[in-house]
From Swiss-Prot:
NCBIfam families: ABC_arch_GlcU. Its main location: membrane. It is a multi-pass membrane protein. Belongs to the binding-protein-dependent transport system permease family. The chain crosses the membrane at residues 14-34, 76-96, 113-133, 149-169, 194-214, 218-238, 250-270. This is Glucose import system permease protein GlcU. It comes from Saccharolobus solfataricus (strain ATCC 35092 / DSM 1617 / JCM 11322 / P2). The gene is glcU.
Length: 287
């Protein structure tokens, strides 16, 4: 009887843990959602998790009107940044992969050194690059421009893409690449026809990760944007809290609106993200 009940107890504890984690994760989302439907007075006079006594849409309407341009700006910047970072990161990961399996010991050593530098670059705080990054963007005449912000984000997210994609590309069977090279296929064609399609689950996982990171990035747009028309969502939300007071219902509504796109991406594409991680954990069986 004990042996029969053991799997049931184990499964029950598993689902209980998932339920607890889900509730903890959903509490901030719930708080943002319901407080956006309150008046500013009610937000201040009632507990944060208590539903509104009277639902009002004023905060959400006001926020949607004021955040329309920042939302568009964020999409214009985040979409190309994410795809370019993930794709170039995949190409870089394949470059390290081919070097590490080279017959030359020097090439393998160079690959290890370069990959270590790339890995180290992902841990450098963006704040530490404030002065050189700003001077670079200003000298290029790209301050307050989409290209300037995208370029700055690429500096940080291409290494991230390479680091993540290297984990997925490294589990691709070496025999496939060697067979293609024996047929006279070039590295670029091998990457486009063999490596990239096989590592697609990893590419999608990397893409989702970079999209969420780029969407939530606060430092880069804070430094490189000086005009209101170029504000991104992460910066625009900050405008609801100032030295002369805070519109709490608008702040909650703005936080909810700003979170909709990354939340939607993870809800609809989260299974591909998990599939990519499972493929990696299975030694590439799902890749």
């Amino acid at each position: 009887m004990d042996k029969k009940m053991r799997p049931v107890i184990k499964a029950s504890l598993h689902y209980l843990a998932l339920a607890i984690v889900s509730v903890i994760w959903l509490i901030p989302v719930y708080a943002m959602l319901i407080n956006g439907f309150k008046s500013n007075f009610e937000v201040l006079s009632t507990p944060v998790l208590v539903p509104p006594t009277k639902i009002t849409f004023e905060a959400y309407v006001s926020v949607l009107l004021s955040l329309a341009k920042p939302l568009i700006n964020s999409l214009i910047i985040v979409i190309p940044t994410s795809f370019i970072s993930a794709f170039l990161g995949a190409m870089g990961a394949y470059f390290f992969y081919t070097l590490s399996y080279s017959f030359s010991r020097a090439s393998s050593a160079i690959s290890d050194v370069l990959f270590s530098l790339i890995s180290l670059a992902t841990f450098i705080p963006q704040e530490a690059t404030l002065l050189p990054l700003t001077r670079l963007i200003v000298s290029m005449g790209l301050l307050d421009s989409y290209i300037g912000i995208i370029f700055a984000l690429l500096i940080f997210y291409i290494p991230t893409g390479a680091l993540l994609m290297s984990m997925f590309i490294s589990v691709i069977p070496r025999s496939l690449i060697e067979a293609a090279k024996m047929d006279g296929t070039g590295d670029l064609k091998i990457f486009m026809k063999i490596v990239f399609p096989l590592s697609m689950p990893g590419f999608i996982s990397t893409l989702i990760f970079i999209i969420i990171q780029a969407w939530n990035n606060f430092f880069i747009p804070l430094v490189l944007v000086t005009t209101p028309g170029m504000k991104l969502t992460s910066i625009a939300v900050l405008s609801y809290s100032g030295a002369y007071g805070t519109l709490y219902n608008d702040t909650f509504a703005a936080g909810m609106v700003a979170s909709i796109i990354p939340l939607a991406i993870f809800v609809f594409l989260g299974r591909y993200f998990i599939r990519g991680l499972m493929a990696l954990g299975g030694g590439g069986k799902g890749v």
